[in-house]
């Protein structure tokens, strides 16, 4: 399942699929956080991801439950959790694997400043 973090510290479920989100925002960076509810490192980095989502409104932050979105996991070759895929128009432009807080923060800042 694909969830989009809104900017009021909540997560809402999308009824639409990822391709529709891309069509709606072709020029925006979309960050996909591939996580699992049972994953300890995913839980550890979740507060930072939420903070980034509320701070950087020029980027769309989504959470993808790997147990419910095998097609997206396959498309982006996700092998571990958490994995963060930075996309533009559906194409992966950057990927981070693991609970890499400093790297995640740095990559988000790079993409925000490039817009």
From Swiss-Prot:
Species this chain originates from: Caenorhabditis elegans
Which Cys-Cys disulphide bridges does the record give?
Answer: 39-42
The induction annotation reads:
Up-regulated in response to dietary restriction and during dauer formation.
- The active site consists of 39 (nucleophile), 42 (nucleophile)
Q: Which GO terms describe its biological process?
A: determination of adult lifespan
Instruction: Cite a single GO MF annotation.
Output: protein-disulfide reductase activity
The protein's name: Thioredoxin-1
In what residue span(s) does the Thioredoxin domain sit?
2-114
């Amino acid at each position: 399942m694909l969830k989009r973090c809104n900017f009021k510290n909540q997560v809402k479920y999308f009824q639409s699929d990822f391709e529709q989100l891309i069509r709606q925002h072709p020029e925006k960076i979309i960050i996909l956080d591939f996580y699992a509810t049972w994953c300890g490192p995913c839980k550890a980095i979740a507060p930072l991801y939420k903070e980034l989502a509320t701070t950087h409104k020029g980027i769309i932050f989504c959470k993808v439950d790997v147990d419910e979105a095998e097609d997206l996991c396959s498309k982006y070759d996700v092998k571990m959790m958490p994995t963060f895929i930075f996309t533009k128009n559906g194409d992966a432009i950057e990927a981070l694997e693991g609970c890499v807080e400093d790297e995640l923060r740095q990559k988000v800042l790079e993409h925000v400043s490039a817009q």
